[in-house]
């Protein structure tokens, strides 16, 4: 089966690099499935799981926003943060998830938005960690 090269990169460095059969991500415009030979595309990403299919198995990567760049022979995910399912510290993610009080108090709009994003990232990381 044909493959497409995938690179997942964060400001801290590369997280994943391999050839896969299919990439599935959640963009701001909706779900995208990328196969080898896909037309060029750039799309902003949601906080979600990137699914990388290879050899009948699926690997999951928690992606915290960023951009997807697609070329016919490669896909690059430029993420603000990204973690492979097996690398996620579940206890830390659960601690973040339980920190909902800043959302409830809404003391400051900026604090609320930061807390909301932290909660989304924690919930995404837990979801991806459960998929491994």
UniProtKB/Swiss-Prot annotation:
Role noted for this protein: Produces ATP from ADP in the presence of a proton gradient across the membrane.
Chain coiled-coil ranges: none
Pfam families tied to this protein: ATP-synt_DE, ATP-synt_DE_N
CDD domains named in the record: F1-ATPase_delta
PANTHER family: ATP SYNTHASE DELTA/EPSILON CHAIN, ATP SYNTHASE EPSILON CHAIN, CHLOROPLASTIC
Gene Ontology cellular-component terms listed: plasma membrane; proton-transporting ATP synthase complex
Keyword Cell membrane attributed: yes
Entry's family note: Belongs to the ATPase epsilon chain family.
Subcellular localization: Cell membrane
Subunit record text: F-type ATPases have 2 components, CF(1) - the catalytic core - and CF(0) - the membrane proton channel. CF(1) has five subunits: alpha(3), beta(3), gamma(1), delta(1), epsilon(1). CF(0) has three main subunits: a, b and c.
Organism: Bacillus sp. (strain PS3)
Protein name per Swiss-Prot or TrEMBL: ATP synthase epsilon chain
Mode of membrane association: Peripheral membrane protein
Alphabetized UniProt keyword annotations: ATP synthesis, Cell membrane, CF(1), Hydrogen ion transport, Ion transport, Membrane, Transport
Upper lineage: Bacteria, Bacillati, Bacillota, Bacilli, Bacillales
GO molecular function: ATP binding; proton-transporting ATP synthase activity, rotational mechanism
Keyword Ribosomal protein part of the UniProt annotation: no
């Amino acid at each position: 089966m044909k493959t497409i090269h995938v690179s997942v990169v964060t400001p801290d460095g590369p997280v994943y690099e391999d050839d896969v059969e299919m990439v599935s991500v959640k963009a701001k415009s909706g779900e995208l499935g990328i196969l080898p030979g896909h037309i060029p595309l750039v799309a902003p990403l949601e906080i979600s799981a990137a699914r990388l299919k290879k050899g009948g198995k699926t690997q999951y990567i928690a992606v915290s926003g960023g951009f997807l760049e697609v070329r016919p022979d490669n896909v690059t995910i430029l993420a603000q943060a990204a973690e492979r399912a097996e690398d996620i510290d579940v206890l830390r993610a659960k601690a973040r998830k339980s920190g909902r009080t800043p959302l409830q108090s809404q003391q400051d709009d900026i604090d609320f938005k930061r807390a909301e994003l932290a909660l989304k990232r924690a919930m995404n990381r837990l979801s991806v960690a459960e998929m491994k």
